[in-house]
Amino acid sequence: IGLSLVGSEMCIRDRLRNDQLNNKNKIKIGFIGGGPNSFIGYTHRLAARFDNRFNFVAGVFSKDKKKSKEFGKSLGLDTDRCYNDYKIMAKKESARSDGVQAVGIMTPSGDHYKIAREFIKSNVHIICDKPLTSKVEDAVALEKLVHKNKIVFALTHNYSGYPMLREAKKLVEKNKIGKIKLINVEYPQGYTVAVKKKDEKSTLKWRLDKNMCGPSMILAEIGTHAYHLMRYVTGLEVNEVSAEVNSLSDEISVDDNAFMTVRMNNKARGSIWVSSAATGGENGLKIRVYGTKGAVEWLQDDPNILKFTELNSSTQIITRASDAVSDLSIQSSRVAAGHPEGFFEAFANIYTEFADSIQANLKKNKKDLIHPTVNDGVMGIKFIFAAKKSSNLNSKWIKI
């Protein structure tokens, strides 16, 4: 499909213009978690800086006050705004005229609800790692709080920020592939193959400690991503799931592999395979959607292209930022076609859209939300429990 620089160059100019416009009106943000050696903490901070929409002013980086202040200072923060407890941060920041307007939460999922609840009391907007919580009742309660207080809540299902994944969604919406019949999502990783029992006390403890990872490590870590991707691209909902969730490792006790078959609300069928026990697997996230008129395929290993096949026709390769893609895909890009974009840019799209939603909220304007929301989080935690229940009942079909 033809390639053009026009769309992407316009997008870059628009972003530069927005960068200048928003320089005087940045949203003050703080972070809970993501201390030293945290990849996800680094990712959140980088994503928040990408489009110059946030001013990073405060945070909790350790339960140890000295360590939190030292790390905050290394990030350029005023040490008076580096806390060791989220309740103290919420109280002190709410008392300031220049206090945080938003917080990013990147702690174990069991802590998400109580942290978010504390800041919602002060009308602080939330961007949170997935899964939303570790309990269904906490997720439902959090959703009610968000709506009651009219808070903007974004969930970092960051893969939905990839431009060409968004293009796949647009092709589905335009009925280019017809009625959806089959959906396949897979996400193989391989790190638990080499994990040993002693690693449960290492930096992997969030994933390997049952008390921290919730009812199922693999479903919480990447199963929710696969499930969200299926819903996001197709616009469909999963009605029922039949699952086999287990641990293939002899060294650890948490789940590290899941095979799932799903029934969609349009009677389509789908399959999801997620694993951290796939030897050699890195982050091979892949989605394929098959319909009556065509099919789309996207792979994170090659994120700047989308394969689109029309019925009785050859497969087309659509490239990011080309003249063939939708406005949404163009708006989600930063550099001209031919230059690669990847994980960090996709994550940054969620942050930028979070900022857009906050600005609309402050002006009391209604805005169609592009980023994942608290509702997506509720659906994700319900999916975890349904799949785990199915597995415990010998793969019985369970409604979500």
Task: State the predicted function of each range.
Residues C128, S134, F153-L155, N184, ...:
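Hydrophobic residues in well-ordered beta-strands that form the structural core
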Residues R81-L145:
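Beta-loop-alpha module in the N-terminal Rossmann-like domain of NAD(P)-dependent dehydrogenases
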Residues L16-Q20, N158, F259, M264, ...:
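C-terminal glycine/acidic-rich active-site capping loop/insertion
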Residues I1-I12:
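Single conserved hydrophobic/aromatic residue that forms the stacking wall/gate
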Residues V152, Y159-I252, L306, N394:
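Predominantly a Rossmann-like dinucleotide-binding segment in NAD(P)-dependent oxidoreductases
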Residues R13-L77, A355:
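N-terminal Rossmann-like dinucleotide-binding module
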Residues R13-N25, G104, H339, E353-I400:
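C-terminal helix-rich "cap/oligomerization" subdomain common to oxidoreductases
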Residues A220-A295, Q300-N304:
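Glycine-rich, aromatic-lined ligand/substrate-binding cores of catalytic
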